[in-house]
Structure formats: structure tokens, C-alpha cells
Amino acid sequence: MIKIGILGGEANGSNAIDIIRRIPSFRLVGFYDPDPLRRETLERACRLHSFSNPEMLTGVADAIDIAGPLSHYPSAFRQAIRESKHVFLHNPYTGKASVLRELLKLIGESRGVVQVSQPHRFNPAFLAAFPYVKTPGYMEFQRKIPFRQAGNSQSLVLQYLMHDIDLAMYLTRSNIRKSSVSGVRLVSARPDLVEARLEFENGCVANFMINRVGQEQSHTCHLYQTGMTIRIDLLRQKAEIQHLKNPGPGNVSGTRTSTEQLLVTPSDPLADEMMSFHTSIHNRQSPLVNLEDAFRALEISLDLQERLNWLSVN
């Protein structure tokens, strides 16, 4: 039985409580939130013990789920790492890349598992399509979020686009050679439509588009590689492959295509990644998504956000 505590009572924290309670091998020992009112409300609603400070919670738990931004709990994270506790991070954002580099060095001295939330990697549609991904030459990620759901105070790059960037880097396994970003403000002080482009050293190009002023919600990924295109619907958890066959010279009918619907078993990616965290702890193995992977995606996202900020004021 692994004793686990939660830092942060925001939406991620509330959801984490529900998920962890469904995993019998975890024993939820309590939570901490810096907001006294939210702490009291969540304690009553979830019938869960709340701690008065994060250090006390970290001290009694074997594992910590940091549901809020890492920048809110740096000391608790350092304590957990020094004591070789296991840590699950929902948001690795620390405000500064230098702080994250320091934390990366600390992790090297720890015997604990540190996993970063990347639910898209656990999406059943992505998992069904992944074995067919070889060497994509072009990738296209599109995401539409209803305005009321996204709000207008969040950074589209750091809140949403960063996860798609992680997927692209995971699929290519290549360093980024060049990047660009643009944005348009329609109804908010921040850009409501963002487009980004990454060019990798292996020749692959990834384009990203995110829009938070549409009425409909969608999240898709298209991969183009020799002989096929792969379409992944991350929202509806569907995936298909379009096989392309060149009929050869002299045939005027053009390229022949056939579509294959992949078998996808619907699941909850958030619950699956938490179960993966438990498995990594139990088997003493490296997590699927570690802090080094998250740092690379965060670093490029921060660079894109900085350039987007500059464009917004010029």
C-alpha cells in the first residue's frame, strides 16, 4: 500500500482525489491547499483530512501528487526529492527555466519516481496509432476550445499547446532546428488563436493551431509518412489509417487509397497515467513521462510564449 497526498485543491486536485480513490493500491492520506476557504470546502465535500502546511503532508506520505503549478510548491518538491519520495507533477511550470534545471539536478540524487502528467500519451486513440508511426515527415495538430471553457486569462501555449508539443517531440525523437509562432487577439487581452511551427533536425515539420473562440470542441492530430496518413481524434478517442499505394507508371487512375479504422478501447487517460505512476513505483522503473521530457517541451513552449508576448505588444 502506497501512502499518497495531494498538494493543491484546484480542479486538478479534486479530480486527482477521485482517481486515486479508485486505485486500491494507493491510500490517500490527505491534501493541502494554500487557500483556507478552498481547503475547508474540499475537506467537507471529499471527507478527506487537510494539512496545515505542505511540508507536514510530504513528511507522512510515500508519494506526492502536486496538482497545482510546481511554482507554488518548490520547497515541498525539494523536500520530497531529498527524502526520495515519489512525485507526480500535473504542471512542471516553475516560472524560470533555471529553477527547473536546478530541480533536474536534484532528481539525479533521488531514488524516487518523478512522473509528469501528459494524458495525451495515455489516450487510447494515440496508443492504438503509435505502433504504426515510423518516420513522419509532417504532423498537424489542431485544437478548438469553447471560449467559456478556456477562459481568457490563460496562456494557450502553456496551458494547451505544450502538451501537443510534447507529443510531437515524442513521435519524432529529434532535436528542434527552428521554430516560429504567431497569434491573433480577437476578444481577449491575450491571443485567442495561436499557430506555431517546429522544424526538426531529421526533416520532420510539425504545425500547431489552437483556437479558443469557436463554438465546437475538437482535438486532432494528423501524421503523414511514406505510404500512409494517420488521423488521431484525441477528443473522441478514434484513430484511422489511410494507406496510400502508387499504382506505378502508365496508370492514369492516380494513387489508390484504403482506410483502416483502428480498434480503440475507450478509457480515462488521467486514470491510466496515475495507474502507470503506481506501476513505476511498484516495479521501481522509470516513468513513461519524466521531468527531462517535460523540461524539453516546457523550454520550447516558454520560448514560443516569450516571442508571442513580444508580438502582442509590438
Protein language model features and the residues they cover:
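N-terminal Rossmann-like dinucleotide-binding module
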Residues: M1-A45, W310
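C-terminal helix-rich "cap/oligomerization" subdomain common to oxidoreductases
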Residues: I6, M56, A63-I66, E201, ...
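Short acidic low-complexity segments
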Residues: L48-V60
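Beta-strand-loop-alpha-helix segment that lines the small-molecule cofactor/substrate pocket
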Residues: A63-L70, P74-Q118
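A contiguous active-site-proximal alpha/beta segment in oxidoreductase catalytic domains
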Residues: T94-G151
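Mid-domain beta-loop-alpha active-site segment that forms a flexible
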Residues: S117-P124, F147-K178, D293-A294
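C-terminal glycine/acidic-rich active-site capping loop/insertion
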Residues: P119, G227-E292, V313-N314
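Contiguous beta-strand/loop segments that form the cofactor/metal-binding neighborhood of enzyme cores
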Residues: M162-K238, A271-N283
